[in-house]
């Protein structure tokens, strides 16, 4: 709705006032199926950006037109706030499998893309390309976030496919002159398939998914956002409803990649 769009514009202005300079916008996600009768087809999911490549993909209950998203980025640029758009895949992708069920994973759940299906790559290539191509792309900034958050690591073959997917989309966005940003996942997804690290930025959010010392050794640039300290998920029960401001002010620095024991 227009209210939420105005809120995002206001957020950019507030960030600039407080000298905050980076806003990552997570454009797709979904609920947990246990809250929707254990039925993936009824589980809430949304992708929030207009798409001409895939008409009808954008959520009916609210999305940004391409022009609105471009204008938001221009506002941010004028205020020296960097917007990093994120399309999260190959997990958190129920909005995409609602739209195209054949690319959903039968084994790991429909919120996971099927990494063994070539159609998955065709779909995601088409989606990223829409916002990256042309002289005035929809994704205007220097960085693009490709997701890679919380995919299953139950079997070695799927881990290798996940690593290949990650490497593919790092290089895909780089092909359009962008710097790739990823969620930390490569300790969770240890394997043999190489994943590009040079000039790649990683969200270090949970050490069990990406051990910071290992990731730095491997060549990644890290953004320190330890979930146990800086995540707010109201009423979830496993993260803060409000930040622990006294602790953060007195004790935390961005060099601390873990929560206090």
Model-derived segments and spans:
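Conserved small/polar residues in nucleotide/adenosyl-binding loops
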Residues: 2-7, 257-261
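Substrate-binding cleft of carbohydrate-active enzyme catalytic domains
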Residues: 5-176
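Flexible, acidic glycine-rich loops studded with aromatic residues
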Residues: 14, 194-200, 207-259
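Structural recognition of the beta-strand scaffold that forms the well-ordered cores
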Residues: 24, 144-145, 180-182, 201-204, ...
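Active-site-proximal beta-strand/loop segments in catalytic clefts of secreted hydrolases
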Residues: 86-88, 149, 183-186, 205-206, ...
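Short glycine/threonine-rich loop-to-helix capping motif typified by GTGT followed
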Residues: 152-165, 192-207
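Acidic/polar loop patches that form or flank catalytic/metal-binding clefts of enzymes
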Residues: 174-184, 212, 222-226
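Acidic, contiguous N-terminal accessory segments
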Residues: 180-189, 196
């Amino acid at each position: 709705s227009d209210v939420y769009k105005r809120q995002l514009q206001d957020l950019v202005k507030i960030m600039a006032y407080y000298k905050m300079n980076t806003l990552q916008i997570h454009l797709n996600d979904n609920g947990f199926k246990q809250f929707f009768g254990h039925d993936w087809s009824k589980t809430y999911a949304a992708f929030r950006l207009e798409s001409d490549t895939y008409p009808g993909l954008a959520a009916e209950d609210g999305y940004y037109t391409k022009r609105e998203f471009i204008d938001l980025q221009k506002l941010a640029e004028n205020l020296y706030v960097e917007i990093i758009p994120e399309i999260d895949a190959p997990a958190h992708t129920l909005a995409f499998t609602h739209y195209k069920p054949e690319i959903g994973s039968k084994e790991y759940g429909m919120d996971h893309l099927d990494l063994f299906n070539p159609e998955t790559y065709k779909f995601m290539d088409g989606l990223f390309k829409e916002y990256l191509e042309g002289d005035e792309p929809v994704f205007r900034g220097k960085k693009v976030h490709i997701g890679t958050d919380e995919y299953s690591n139950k079997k070695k073959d799927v881990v290798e496919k996940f690593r290949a997917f990650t490497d593919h989309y790092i290089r895909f966005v780089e092909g359009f002159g962008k710097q790739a940003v990823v969620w930390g996942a490569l300790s969770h997804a240890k394997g043999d398939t190489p994943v590009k690290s040079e000039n790649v930025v990683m969200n270090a959010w949970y050490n069990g998914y990406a051990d910071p010392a290992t990731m730095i050794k491997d060549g990644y640039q890290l953004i320190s956002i330890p979930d146990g300290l800086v995540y707010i998920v109201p009423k979830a029960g496993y993260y803060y409803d409000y930040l622990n401001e006294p602790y953060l002010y007195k004790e935390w620095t961005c060099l601390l990649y873990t929560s206090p024991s």
